[in-house]
Amino acid sequence: EEKSMKKNDIFELEITDMGTDGEGIGHYDGMTFFVKDALIGDVITARATKLKKNYGYARVEEIKTPSTFRVEPQCELHKRCGGCQIQALSYEKQLEFKNNKVRNNLMRIGGFSEAELDSKMQPPVGADNPYRYRNKAQFPVGYDRDGNIVTGFYASRSHNIIPVEDCRLGVPQNKEILDIIKEWMNECGITPYDENTHKGLVRHVLIRYGFTSKQIMVCLVINGDSLEAKRRAGNAADILCESCLLYT
């Protein structure tokens, strides 16, 4: 039987579940729809963007009735950045989502029965504060459209850099360090690595913070096999840290 639904059709959809990547799942006209940025419990106006035989994809046109699990996100970039797809979901519901994801994978891939998991699998232990807890972060370096040096994170399923000044999951010191590195690169004519041309020096900045020691390790991941290139990267140590190890 041919479906009446066509691409760009607009329809009301209740989100009743969430997929493994945090997308909302709803059912309409005998089809299952996957909707980015929709949360379980939302009632939305959706626009069909891609249709298959029994399922399709849609985007949110309007949230008609917000889910009771929907909260105000801490980061305005959560929809674009590839790391916080479910930040608009309450933390308690995030834990439930992650628990179900692990549980379903153990049954589907590991072959465990529901009874086995009921007896052996413990619920996840949540953090007292789900922000500012990550002691390690790696930031790709590149250019924005105006030719300015930027650091940030990759957009979902791409290597396009979303400029991030201060990720709420990492420590506040990251922003200051990244600002110093960008200033150093601009002043010294140091270029970011370009994945298309394979030219440029600085690929990533890795920062690790010791919550106990209060020490910070900064690693510049560079595209340079010559000692001179590495020395140019090592010059940043005068600004960034007390000591520097230069590997040749």
Feature-to-residue mapping (PLM):
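Accessory RNA-recognition modules of RNA-modification enzymes
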Residues: 2-246
